[in-house]
């Protein structure tokens, strides 16, 4: 097991909990992980261990309102706060490794946030991006009455939180992964009316706005994902010219945690090697 480092950085006057798996040597790349809704940075240990053995450093932080970072669980005032957190983590990684290329990895909500970051900030510091099961099109059927409540009430009661309606067995075919998730004290199932509104606005922008993401982007999704539809990944693949789409027929929502994860992590690594500067 590779040693982890823990610390807090400040973003918009909030503590952001940052985990890192630093390389003992000069890393060839550093990966910044943006996790999904309700989870946290600590769920990426196996991911990090795989890449550390390849001499690639890994940094994973808890989003505001998640894990050990500040904020009401499952709530945010503005999507910009997430974007600023990504930027501040990026600045910290760049401060430590001035010349090491950086890869942005985003899963589920994190995939949506990674795309939004690439669109909004147009950072020259990101060399590659890997987008996993991006929250663009949901498979979970949200009752119409809840959508109406959300639209009407989010301005009046932005911090009201509802269940995210996640069925944990849809995360992975690996029962051990599912059990760990269900018993993880840092995991929550909350989403506020305002966070849902901010996510929906961000998704609409990603779908409809014209943008040019120049860096190579790998988009990955499982066709058996019952939480987020792979159709959304197909859509963003068409919009991003320099992207590659990889669909897995039998993979669930978390490719990096499913039974095929060794194959999938090797695929990520091959993508990185093929774009080595």
Regions found by a protein language model. Give the residues of each.
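Short beta-strand/loop motif that positions the catalytic acidic residue
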Residues: 213, 219-221, 225
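Active-site glycine-rich loops that stabilize anionic/oxyanionic intermediates
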Residues: 36-39, 223
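Conserved hydrolase catalytic core segment
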Residues: 101, 109-131, 137
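Catalytic nucleophile-loop/oxyanion-hole region of alpha/beta-hydrolase
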Residues: 38-41, 67-97, 264
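Short alpha-helix in the alpha/beta-hydrolase fold that links the catalytic acid
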Residues: 215, 229-238
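N-terminal cap/lid segment of alpha/beta-hydrolase-fold proteins
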Residues: 1-25
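Catalytic active-site module of serine/aspartate enzymes centered on a nucleophile-bearing elbow/loop
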Residues: 244-277
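Conserved alpha/beta-hydrolase
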Residues: 43, 48-72
